[in-house]
Amino acid sequence: MPSIHPQHLDTVKQTYHHKFAPEDEIFSHIHRGDRIFISTACGEPQYALRALMKYVETHPKAFAEAEVMHIWTLGVAPYADEKYTYNFRHNSFFVGDNTRDSVNRGIADYTPVFLSQIPSLINHKRIPIDVALIQTSLPDKNGFVSLGISVDICRAAIDNATIIIAQINENMPRVHGDTFINIDAIDFMIHHDEPLLEYAPQIPGQIALQIGNYVSKIINDGDTIQLGYGSTPNAILSNVSEKHDLGVHTELLTDSMVELIRRGVINNSKKNINKGKTIASFCMGTAHTYQFIDDNPAVEFRGIDYTNDPRIICTIENMTAINSALQIDLTGQATAESIGRQFYSGIGGSADFMRGSVLAPGGKTILVIQSTARDGDVSRIVPFLDSGAGVTLNRGDVHYVVTEYGIAYIHGKNIRERAMSLIGIAHPKFRLQLIEEAKQLNLIYRDQAFIPGKEGEYPEYIETVRTTRKGQVVLFRPVKIDDEPLIKDLFYDMSDKSLQRRFMSFRKDVPHEMRQEFVVIDYTKEMVILATVQEHGKEVVVGMAQAIKDVNTHTAEVAFAVRDSYQDKGIGTELISYLTILAQKEGLQGFTADVLVENKPMLHLFEKMGFEIEKKVEAGAYELKMRFR
């Protein structure tokens, strides 16, 4: 991506010959105890770094205990090697694969801090920078180079460094935004063209793809999104290709995001700030992506104190932050940075984006996590975080938690409710254990029932969306183990008359012990179908159908309830119609039901379904036997 003619570069070298000094002379300006900043991730100046290490090997006493600082390195990190402890001390704001061992052995450092705060710490000299070792594009005709794919904290580092050493590389794209530096501000330049580091995350597996499918159901047309690192975010993006008018305000720009920009899925047209612009702070991808962002005015890179500032994020309408975690407990605390006492990654930008998005108008926060680790041997959903684990996200930071087993909405829920919701999306083989541990810790009811094994696994395939004759769009789905609060709201919102018709007797309450019978079921023997709608962004149960199989007669005993405010809107008709379809698929031949004589609407509903009906009156109620035609 050359931005100038080679002859002009020769002119620059002649004009600024003192800046293109021999490498040994350049590195001789580094002194003992200096703090050296290195560009982030794929923006790492590989040749310049190799040259620095060569200088240290030939001049082993040139300087001592220089502190090497960066967010994250993807390239080699020789300065973290134990043999260079005299010369370097590595200090990272994020722990990567090639520095994790050194950090946990105590021969390298990790500084836990919100990424949005690092530029301020640098600007106020709380984190002083003596030398900035960066990589840039070639200078343009006006004498400016671009930081290209790594702006993040690099901008603050060069604004405050005593010495700036830049490797200029024709392969570094010129990216719009806060990326430009005049060569007058650079102390030394090393011209070396080489391919930029590339980042290719693992191809998403089946688990990641299933998580991505669930997350896509939460993302709406017009949302502005932020995603973290790894194969799961890529799986999420592969599932949103049918969305429209998405925006991006993120820390990290990836290949998958760029592909959606190419397709027009991401166009930033609905953003209320930076409209029409994809905003990011750095990029990790392939050369194909680097070419796309080169001199592309639709993409702007800003300092991480802008992209990650919760005060800015909270002003973005429909901001949706999607980040991953290593472990989450039943109270909603999550760690994305450590496995127990072992440092694994870092705070990163997830806390910045999650907290900003919680406050944004229409904002959402989504935490994605695979249900197990260590090849399925341990659950990532636990009663409480492991001892020593850093709490990256607290109990108020997360709206949705998504595993390959479903979606748990925990925002605004009490500890008991969120514990049950999270158990419901844990790996099935760990659910009984989590139930028992949660009981012992008084997180849930002491008498909480549970059905282990296949019999208790949620049959998601039964979910369907239908529109009633009155135009009401309704989700029909099986009951879940965490639906007790929704069932309680349904029953207690019903009139005494409706309750009497449902339970065939007069009653004022439907206590917890009774409600459990509706939500903890053996799906192979009975079915409870809920009819739900969204009211003010909240799922509300407006109707319920229950069917209990009789294997001897090949029928099912059924009962129905519809919230009073939704009666006469076709909810009951759709419930019985769908329950009939499910029963026929199971090979059942009909229904039985008890209906109070006074319950004319229910009787009429059965009659209009076209069943062959036998009626018998007993103690003020019809005993109905209904055969499918």
Q: Residue locations for each model-derived region?
A:
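Conserved alpha/beta enzyme-core scaffold
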Residues: 1-452
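Long, contiguous binding/interaction regions
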Residues: 457-629
